[in-house]
Amino acid sequence: MIYRELSQAEFNDLASRILYEDNHLLVVNKKVGEIVQGDKTSDEPLTETYKAFIAQRDAKPGQVFMGLPHRLDRPVSGIVVLAKTSKALERLNAMFRDSDVHKFYWALVCAEPRPAEGSSLSVGFGECPHTPLSLNSFFNK
């Protein structure tokens, strides 16, 4: 399969967003506004973008496998785990299905939110840029 050629700037951006990689996994930082899998829009999903990246970086002439065991919505930023092999995808799917993966979500807001009755809220400190809400999802085992 022939993948599109990435510009040097896009290639460098994608490379800088890799948090972890081995023969089985690719863990990347997803930006707000990106989609992780195809939808009815013509936007290229992150899975296809990283297939093109791997093909170009490794000069791989054949098809690149990139499985998606979980998703993050378009308006969300955070960590996405991609499977580079079908066996890794199978195992990751089982981990998500069996709740062996723990997800953590953080929201950045400009005003101090009030927790709903019966819930808890941890408030941190930091600068508040006037940008849309951004959520981060972090995974660990």
Question: Where in the sequence are the language-model features?
Answer:
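RNA pseudouridine synthases
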Residues: 1-141
